[in-house]
Amino acid sequence: MTQKYLFIDRDGTLISEPPEDFQVDRFDKLAFEPQVIPALLKLQQEGYKLVMITNQDGLGTDSLPQEAFDGPHNLMMQIFASQGVNFEEVLICPHFPGDNCACRKPKTQLVLPWLEEGVLDKSHSYVIGDRATDLELADNMGITGLRYDRETLDWPTICEQLTRSDRYAHVERITKETQVDVKVWLDREGGSKIHTGVGFFDHMLDQIATHGGFRMEVNVGGDLYIDDHHTVEDTGLALGEALKLALGDKRGINRFGFVLPMDECLARCALDISGRPHLEYKADFTYQRVGDLSTEMVEHFFRSLSYTMAVTLHLKTKGKNDHHRVESLFKAFGRTLRQAIRVQGDALPSSKGVL
């Protein structure tokens, strides 16, 4: 059985990196990053194993004598251990960049044992560090990199991201007309992959994911040689079901969302993740198609989605350009969905006790 790991940089991530020489070679230079110990304790409780991996330029040379390094490093390790933070391994590259060694990050020689088959849970393992080389190491290992920063991605934030439930769902819908495969990750952004065979529809689905702040993968094979009806309808049904499943018991979600974005088009969207499917829709189009998408299928898509997602959805748009009118509906729905699915606690947002 594979194991989830965190491969964590030392200087600038676990402990502060002295700006004058970037070396922790005296005891008075040793300072821990804010909240690092509580975060690591929580991450261990969630099943992560910890590996420290660090480049220490010229370790063992006059540039960084071994004895100068060992004192602060050993004290750091003793403090971590005394608080219950345990590292499975400490991996150190002692070379200078110009040595062209095989073990310096972002090269992978030091982590080869974890890259063997059946060791690493790559979907739930991460490299955490403050430099671009840490992210490159993650890419080389085939896992996700997180760039630590006190202001934008500090230890409490990293801990929250890695310990919250991964709201994910996978739905397959196979009929005589279509084969639809949908995956959604509500707590991950970017990297959506969408292919329905209808190019403009792909673009619209990407608007939902982008403005909704989540990731989805959609693959559809259908009877487009007839028209786009079954492809759009069944994609809406499958996506709605996937969103409903990914939301789980809905505890902590905002439940409601409302947006009124005004650009060339005025689009209105109100959403209630109510458990009751209903659609109110108002949009008029000049032409029968936008790109390769039938404009009449826009309403049908949202009706199908609201039915399987079991939500109450109100959509309305006004404007002069059909392309922009259609896009405004998908964009407004995405922004509204972002509000409604956001988790802000653990209470069920219903006086009835059920959604």
Swiss-Prot record:
UniProt keywords, alphabetically: Amino-acid biosynthesis, Cytoplasm, Histidine biosynthesis, Hydrolase, Lyase, Magnesium, Metal-binding, Multifunctional enzyme, Zinc
Positions of the UniProt region annotated as Imidazoleglycerol-phosphate dehydratase: 167-355
Pathway named in the protein's UniProt entry: Amino-acid biosynthesis; L-histidine biosynthesis; L-histidine from 5-phospho-alpha-D-ribose 1-diphosphate: step 6/9; Amino-acid biosynthesis; L-histidine biosynthesis; L-histidine from 5-phospho-alpha-D-ribose 1-diphosphate: step 8/9
Keyword Magnesium on entry: yes
InterPro entries per record: HAD-like_sf, HAD-SF_hydro_IIIA, HAD_sf, His_synth_bifunc_HisB, HisB_N, Histidinol-phos, IGPD_sf, ImidazoleglycerolP_deHydtase
Signal sequence residues: none
Any GO MF annotation of the entry: metal ion binding
Membrane-spanning intervals of the chain: none
Entry-linked PROSITE patterns: IGP_DEHYDRATASE_1, IGP_DEHYDRATASE_2
Binding-site residues, Mg(2+): D9, D11, D130
GO CC field: cytoplasm
One GO BP: L-histidine biosynthetic process
Region (Histidinol-phosphatase): 1-166
Enzyme Commission number, as recorded: 3.1.3.15, 4.2.1.19
Catalytic activity line of the entry: D-erythro-1-(imidazol-4-yl)glycerol 3-phosphate = 3-(imidazol-4-yl)-2-oxopropyl phosphate + H2O; L-histidinol phosphate + H2O = L-histidinol + phosphate
SUPFAM superfamilies xrefs: HAD-like, Ribosomal protein S5 domain 2-like
Binding-site residues for Zn(2+), renumbered to this chain: C93, H95, C101, C103
Cofactor field: Mg(2+); Zn(2+)
Similarity comment: In the N-terminal section; belongs to the histidinol-phosphatase family. In the C-terminal section; belongs to the imidazoleglycerol-phosphate dehydratase family.
Protein name stated in the entry: Histidine biosynthesis bifunctional protein HisB
Species whose genome carries this gene: Klebsiella pneumoniae subsp. pneumoniae (strain ATCC 700721 / MGH 78578)
Gene label: hisB
